[in-house]
Amino acid sequence: MSGHRNLKRRCGESHLESPAGCAHGPAAACVLSKLVQLPTPPLSKHQLKRLEEHKYQSAGRSLLEPLMQGYWEWLVGKVPAWIAPNLITIIGLLINIFTTLLLVYYCPTATEQAPPWAYIACACGLFIYQSLDTIDGKQARRTNSSTPLGELFDHGCDSLSTVFVVLGTCIAVQLGTNPDWMFFCCFAGTFMFYCAHWQTYVSGTLRFGIIDVTEVQIFIIIMHLLAVIGGPPFWQSLIPILNIQVKIFPALCTVAGTIFSCTNYFGVIFTGGVGKNGSTIAGTSVLSPFLHIGSVIALAAMIYKKSAVQLFEKHPCLYILTFGFVSAKITNKLVVAHMTKSEMHLHDTAFIGPALLFLDQYFNSFIDEYIVLWIALIFSLFDLLRYCVSVCNQIAAHLHIHVFRIKSSSTHSNHH
């Protein structure tokens, strides 16, 4: 979810396979490497220089963090010193994604009931991700392998995890029966994560509230366990006095959380940034990042409401994943803009997927919307992965480090 507080300047470690090594590797590996690499480096020399100078800054502490510190310290002590922090993060993310996809498989419309073990697996997957996402920073400091890449990698994984976590929660409470609520909850989650980094782009400091990521994740784990214990009858039962279904309660909590968080975020954003004349850390308008997330949500809402075949109602999981990948990419670009003190540009290949859906509807669904949704999903995922791999490779090459491996004799501290 929202870039874990225990990141603490953690940044990461290694080189994915780079195209430079193609001449010495198998032809298939060379083709694959080129396929997932952008044709031109995503970051300029000036951005890389400013990235080296970046310092991680955070403020605030959540309610459960002091209580969880003992467990996190114990857990990181069990991790071998040779395991890179980024490897810890990616393992947690993959587990989180896999367990959520189990629910997507059994509940494609978020109205079905999955086997009890699937909800338990999803709860465990989220807890594992939370634990590993927290200790990666501790592992980086413990092994003296903190670099700016790790901070970016951590936030990047969080941006993708957010999409799967909110989707898994909606499936657990069978919110697909209320598509408007499901749409709101999923996009509210990605919007709040984006806003957390938007205010960081403005102020230069990542702020945490008394109720933050850890608390929300524990609440979601409880939702999954309640799905095991109560099942559909529980979510469909009415809350006395309020006379609303129990499944609407988590949605109302999302509304309250969105209002509370956005009030804090926009309080920072509208107060003025640390740049010249109250601008962002990059000297740009404090409102400029809204164009990106605003475009994503506006396109998602228009396509949802204008679909003649009830595309979102019939395929909510595919729909949320498609726009979730788009949101994850623009969030990653916002984090990069913050860390490199550079401007965000609105034109981006991330919008191609949503644009295909929009144009298909404009021409009266010339192609089946379901087919176009799959095309948009695959393209958006590929576009996200291609950007992330390219950025990680470029930064790792620049800092002479590895993404998933700790160099035996390194001077990572030079890049703190």
Curated annotation (Swiss-Prot):
Amino-acid biosynthesis keyword on record: no
Binding locations of Mg(2+) 1: 133, 154
Pfam family, one: CDP-OH_P_transf
Annotated binding of Mg(2+) 2, by residue: 133, 154, 158
Reaction equations catalysed: CDP-ethanolamine + a 1,2-diacyl-sn-glycerol = a 1,2-diacyl-sn-glycero-3-phosphoethanolamine + CMP + H(+); CDP-choline + a 1,2-diacyl-sn-glycerol = a 1,2-diacyl-sn-glycero-3-phosphocholine + CMP + H(+); 1-O-alkyl-2-acyl-sn-glycerol + CDP-choline = a 1-O-alkyl-2-acyl-sn-glycero-3-phosphocholine + CMP + H(+); a 1-O-(1Z-alkenyl)-2-acyl-sn-glycerol + CDP-choline = a 1-O-(1Z-alkenyl)-2-acyl-sn-glycero-3-phosphocholine + CMP + H(+)
Gene Ontology BP terms: phosphatidylethanolamine biosynthetic process
Site description Increases basicity of active site His, residues in chain: 151
Membrane topology, from the record: Multi-pass membrane protein
Residues at the catalytic site: 155 (proton acceptor)
Binding site for CDP-choline: 86, 151
EC nos: 2.7.8.1, 2.7.8.2, 2.7.8.22
Organism domain of life: Eukaryota
Cofactor field: Mg(2+); Mn(2+)
UniProt GO molecular function: 1-alkenyl-2-acylglycerol choline phosphotransferase activity; diacylglycerol cholinephosphotransferase activity; ethanolaminephosphotransferase activity; metal ion binding
Keyword NAD in annotation: no
Pathway in which this enzyme or protein is active: Phospholipid metabolism; phosphatidylethanolamine biosynthesis; phosphatidylethanolamine from ethanolamine: step 3/3; Phospholipid metabolism; phosphatidylcholine biosynthesis; phosphatidylcholine from phosphocholine: step 2/2
Transmembrane segments: 89-108, 116-133, 156-176, 180-199, 210-230, 246-267, 286-306, 315-334, 349-363, 368-388
Family: Belongs to the CDP-alcohol phosphatidyltransferase class-I family.
UniProt function note: Catalyzes both phosphatidylcholine and phosphatidylethanolamine biosynthesis from CDP-choline and CDP-ethanolamine, respectively. Involved in protein-dependent process of phospholipid transport to distribute phosphatidyl choline to the lumenal surface. Has a higher cholinephosphotransferase activity than ethanolaminephosphotransferase activity.
Protein name: Choline/ethanolaminephosphotransferase 1
Name of the gene: CEPT1
